[in-house]
Swiss-Prot record:
This is Homeobox protein DBX1-A. Residues 234-279, 292-314 are annotated as: Disordered. It comes from the Eukaryota. Transmembrane segments: none annotated. PROSITE patterns: HOMEOBOX_1 (PS00027), HOMEOBOX_2 (PS50071). Belongs to the H2.0 homeobox family. Residues 305-314 have a biased composition (Acidic residues). PANTHER family: DBX (PTHR24331), HOMEOBOX PROTEIN DBX1 (PTHR24331:SF6). It is found in: Nucleus. Pfam families: Homeodomain (PF00046).
């Protein structure tokens, strides 16, 4: 079954598709696709004769209907152009009583709506010196607007829009550890272990921490601080006796440095000196070794000085 309304065009559009046979148009019968030529099909012949003698008629030398036709087309298509260059015909409000008025025509669509009292001025009619507000609208690009320009809406300035400089960089800093307070019993036990070995092993450190009720990190930090304190005292003693601090640190040439306390060394030397004081021939093995080394050093130094003298003389 075929639907007749779909196949056959309705009778309403027949006038738009072909002109009526009884219509005698004064215009030349050449094919044209202008809006005016399409709209004048439904106009009566009396209206066409009236429009032929409009005030915008051209001089006698030219065709009398070409210019008004173009003027009407410009009035219907772009009213702003005719207002700028001057109207070709007196401006009359379009009303629904006009027989040629079409509700959905080009003039009705392009005409300004009656609800808007004032139409926005075009960009061409604005003088460049009359800008009192920024030219760019907020909807154009919100990042172009600066905080120095007045804005009708609350726009956040550009420096505050970026949050990445305020983000935390890297890992968060760990808080400062509280200083551990050791009791006298804990301090004595730690000092006793330090006198046995300056560098405590990890298993012994864990055992000592469990025995004293401390954390492994607390025992580790205590030994580090105690070794630094001991090295400082050892350095002062070595510097006073002509040594250097590197003697207390393990190196390739000296992987096992002398880690005995300087105070104990000095006390042992004093005890040996006091014990050997009554006899003139009593010498401690350490003193004998030191004397032999001193004599060998002086002998070598004298030989070196003599060789230098010989070299300089020759």
């Amino acid at each position: 079954m075929m639907i007749p309304s779909v196949i056959a065009p309705p009778a309403i559009y027949s006038a738009f598709m072909r002109p009526a046979a009884s219509l005698h148009s004064p215009f030349p019968a050449h094919p044209s696709f202008l809006v005016e030529d399409l709209l004048r099909i439904n106009r009566p012949s009396g209206f066409l004769s009236q429009t032929a003698h409009s005030p915008c008629a051209s001089p006698p030398n030219s065709t009398p209907l070409s210019i008004p036709d173009n003027c009407r087309i410009l009035d219907r298509v772009s009213p702003g152009i005719t207002e700028k260059h001057g109207p070709c015909s007196p401006k009359t409000p379009v009303s629904s009583k006009d027989p040629t008025y079409l509700k959905f025509g080009v003039s009705a669509i392009l005409a300004p709506s009656p609800k808007k009292a004032t139409s926005p001025p075009s960009v061409h009619s604005i003088h460049p010196k009359g800008f009192s507000v920024p030219y760019f609208d907020g909807s154009f690009c919100p990042f172009v607007r600066s905080s120095y320009f007045p804005a009708p809406s609350s726009v956040v300035p550009i420096p505050g829009t970026f949050s990445w400089p305020l983000a935390a960089r890297g890992k968060p800093r760990r808080g400062m550890l509280r200083r551990a307070v050791f009791s006298d019993v804990q301090r004595k036990a730690l000092e006793k272990m330090f006198q046995k070995q300056k560098y405590i092993s990890k298993p012994d450190r864990k055992k000592l921490a469990a025995k004293l009720g401390l954390k492994d990190s607390q025992v580790k930090i205590w030994f580090q601080n105690r070794r630094m304190k001991w090295r400082n005292s050892k350095e002062r003693e070595l510097l006073s006796s002509g040594g250097c601090r590197e003697q207390t640190l393990p190196t390739k040439t000296n992987p096992h440095p002398d880690l005995s306390d300087v105070g104990k060394k000095s006390s042992e030397d004093e005890d040996e000196d006091d014990a050997c004081a009554p006899s003139h021939f009593c010498l401690s093995p350490r003193r004998v070794m030191s004397n032999s080394t001193d004599s060998s050093i002086t002998f070598k130094h004298s030989d070196f000085s003599e060789s230098e003298d010989e070299i300089t003389v020759s």
